[in-house]
Every structure is written in structure tokens, then in C-alpha cells.
Amino acid sequence: MVRTSFQKVLETITRKALPCFLTSTILLMVLPVFAADKQKDEDTLRQANLVLQGLLNSKSISPTLLAKANCVLILPGVKKFGFGVGGSGGRGPLLCRSGQDFKGKWSAPAMYSVGGASVGLQVGGSSSDFVLLLMNSKVVNQVLNGKTKMGTDATAAAGPGATAASASDADIFTYGRAKGVFAGVSLGGATVEPDNDANYRLYSKTLTATDIVRGTDTKPSEEGKALVTVLNSKIGKQSK
């Protein structure tokens, strides 16, 4: 069962049977932090929407490849770690098509985190945007069920350009934006995993990534709805 940091704090308070005044003090300290972090989650969704629209409006990716994607992971503003610390880190929403064969409308967003040295090598300046296309049900199930290392648990490749005659059979295609232009980049060695704390904040209950993107009654926030609307209007359903 998924247990978030916020739930662990509440469990600690309950288990230790702390005095009321101390419990109140702890909650007064924790709740504002929880609210601030939730606002950051909403900001991430809003920024992801802008990144997605930037990719969709660019001529850097084949519409056919987009139409074949089972899921999309959008990572806005991935930041490079400071001097002496290898790699980079960031987070963003994963959205998947509905239906057993991943050909339906797009799901509510589940928040994910990403990290690894290979990401840091691709980050231009202080931060960069990335979009990952998950191309088959095998890699989708891998990503939904826990931490996935690209290149080890799933094959990953730089996304082909819009004029490419064909694409490889990689599980994941990756695009990065540098200086306003999207291009295929390699993120082999990077890891992605569900951000359970962020998902708890966004949905106000404990949900796994699978619950969110494969569920039928998950209700996203307004920022999440806006992201779903863009995907459904720009890409829509896959052809059978």
C-alpha cells in the first residue's frame, strides 16, 4: 500500500498519543507546508501544459508518432544539480490513453519524478523541458508499477524528427527543449518513478499511479483538466 509523507506524520502523531497541544502545534506546522507543496504541484501541471502545447505546435515531431503513443510523460523545468553533484532531477505528469488497448481518450495526470546523471547531461543552462512518449503496454505497465531505469528496464531512444521516414521500435522516445527548440535526446540511464506525495496532495486521497491513469472516476484539478483537454483535442483517440 502506498503511504505518503503526510500520512506518516499523522500515523506518528496517532501512534505516540501526543498531548493535544503538541498535536495541534505539529499540524499547524505541517498543514501550511502541505498547502504550499500542493500549489507547486498545480504550477507543475500548468507548466507541463505549456510544454506540451509547445511540442504539439512545433515541427519537431511526427504527428503519426504522437498518435501511436500510449502515454506521455511531461517534465517541465528539469533542473541540473549543483557543482559536485552528478545528474539532475525534476517531476511532471504522466497521462495515458484509456481502454485495455490504450486507444481511448486521455486519463487524469499522475505525478512522476525523474533523475539521473544522463538527465543532467541533457539539461541546458539551469533547466530544460522534456517530453517522453511511452509506446507500448509493456513499458506502460513497468512505469506504472514502480521505478523504471531507461536503457535497463525499458529501451529508450532519442525521438525522431517530423520528417523521419520511420522510427525504431524503442519502448520510449524522448524529446528535450533547448533554446526554444524541441529535438530528440537520449536519456538512457535516467530513472522515473511515481511521486506518491504529490499524487496524494493533488487528489486528497491515497492513489497509485495505476489508480489515477487507469481509473474511471479520478477527478483531476482544473490544471489537470486543462492538460487532458489539450491532449484530447490535439491528438484524440488512436485509430483502430
Model-derived segments and spans:
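Small-residue-enriched, tightly packed secondary-structure blocks
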Residues: 36-240
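Hydrophobic alpha-helical segments, especially transmembrane helices
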Residues: 16-17, 77
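Low-complexity, Gly/Pro
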Residues: 12, 32-35
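Bacterial N-terminal signal peptides
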Residues: 17-30
